[in-house]
Each structure stands twice: as C-alpha cells, then as structure tokens.
Amino acid sequence: MRPVVSNDGWMHAESDILTLHHYEQDGKKLYSFYDNFEKLVKGASGNPQYQPFAQGYAYRGQPIIMSEFGGTAYVRDEGSGWGYGNGVKSDEEFLERFGGLIEAVQKMSISGYCYTQLTDVEQEVNGLLRADRTAKIAPEKIAEHNR
C-alpha cells in the first residue's frame, strides 16, 4: 500500500504522512517554530498558515516530513528573480543560510525533509541548480550539510 498525503503542507484531513511547509530563511527562527513535538503536530505560533490539520482532525502517529522549506533566492548569476526572503548573492552567503536551515530541520523530531527546490523554474531562482540543470554551488558543498 502506498502512503497518501491529503493536502501537502497544511490543513491535513485524513493523511498517511503529515507534511509541513515553512519558508523562514533564518535557521534558528525556523527551528523555534518546531522545537518540540507539540509544535510540530499542533502548528507553529498560532498562525493559520502553519496549521498542520484542518478543524476536526488531529495527529494519529503519522511520519512527519518537512516537505517544503528553504526556497532561498540565489541571484548571483541570474540578476533578478523570485525566491523566499532576501536573495543571496554569493556562494558563502548561500551556504551559510542553507547550512542553518538544514541544521534546523535535522534537529526537529521529523522523519525527513525536502529542500525547495532542486532547480530554478521560470522566474523562480530558488533552486540548487539553474534551469539548465548546471550547479550553482558545488554539489559536494551541498552534501556536506546533509551528512
């Protein structure tokens, strides 16, 4: 049987996996939203945008995945474009922010995570790769933060 997600990221009803989305760009702030299990399953800071379950539904022991986070705009090569937060303009600045975000989700009581996003798409310059699939940053440097 394959697990089914009822509504990726928020306001789940019946769902086999609890998925969360959060685009805070500061790793310490991101962690503060979900620094204990209760916050993960009840919602972050009372903000309806981050409520994991629709009214009348609650956590039933499902695995928890941060299925979208990050989305940092890296505008060094592209000049301009859209992404979450203030864009970064250097490898060092990107890796510092990326590292903080990865550290935050790795400390959470979750089963997994998926960084947003793999490639740039149209006006979105928040990919780890450019739209032509070439690396913005050496993949080895990205991998260092995921160990």
Annotate each predicted stretch with a short phrase:
Residues H12-S32:
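Short, well-ordered secondary-structure micro-motifs within conserved domains or adaptor modules
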Residues D26-G27, Y31-R147:
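Substrate-binding clefts and catalytic carboxylate motifs of secreted carbohydrate-active enzymes
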Residues G9, Y23, F69:
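Histidine- and/or cysteine-centered catalytic micro-motif in compact active-site loops
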Residues M1-I17, G61:
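Active-site neighborhood of glycoside hydrolase catalytic domains
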Residues N7, H21, T116:
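Conserved residues at the C-terminal ends of beta-strands
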